[in-house]
UniProtKB/Swiss-Prot annotation:
Name of this protein: Conopressin-conophysin
SMART domains: NH
Tissue: Expressed by the venom duct.
TM ranges: none
Domain remark in the UniProt entry: The cysteine framework is C-C.
Disulfide bonds: C21-C26, C43-C83, C46-C57, C51-C73, C58-C63, C90-C108, C102-C120, C109-C114
Compartmental location: Secreted
Alphabetic keyword roster: Amidation, Cleavage on pair of basic residues, Disulfide bond, Hydroxylation, Secreted, Signal, Toxin
Family (UniProt): Belongs to the vasopressin/oxytocin family.
Main localization, broad class: secreted
Length: 121
């Protein structure tokens, strides 16, 4: 029984620490996690800001997630060249998605989630 519990704990730890990339043509580390500056372009702009993920549009006034305005950001997935989200780096305390960008005052986002963050002021 002890070995099974230990194996399940290791499996859960492995699952929580891996970063999956579900966007087509993702480079190593994720589409928006490229820091070398080579072959990277700015992510496309949406109705009131910048696309952060396939369903996330953020600007100075906040973020829209899953709305009609943010649906244009899905086109970003069709481009094989990785893009760079403007904004300082921030850390989220979500399993698997720890590196994000400050995209709006008080908001830190990755390509699939956003969270309030005191470091993004």
């Amino acid at each position: 029984m002890g070995r099974l519990t230990m194996a399940l704990c290791w499996l859960l730890l492995l699952l929580l620490t891996t970063q999956a990339c579900y966007i087509t043509n993702c480079p190593r580390g994720g589409k928006r996690d490229v820091d070398d500056g080579l072959g990277v372009r700015p992510c496309m702009f949406c109705s009131f800001g910048q696309c952060v993920g396939p369903h996330i549009c953020c600007g100075a006034g906040g973020c829209e997630i899953g709305t009609l305005e943010a649906s244009t950001c899905h086109e970003e997935n069709e481009n094989p060249i990785p893009c760079h989200v403007f904004g300082d780096r921030c850390l989220l305390k979500h399993p698997g998605n720890v590196h994000g960008n400050c995209v709006s005052p008080g908001v830190c986002c990755t390509d699939d989630t956003c969270s309030m963050h005191v470091g993004c002021l």
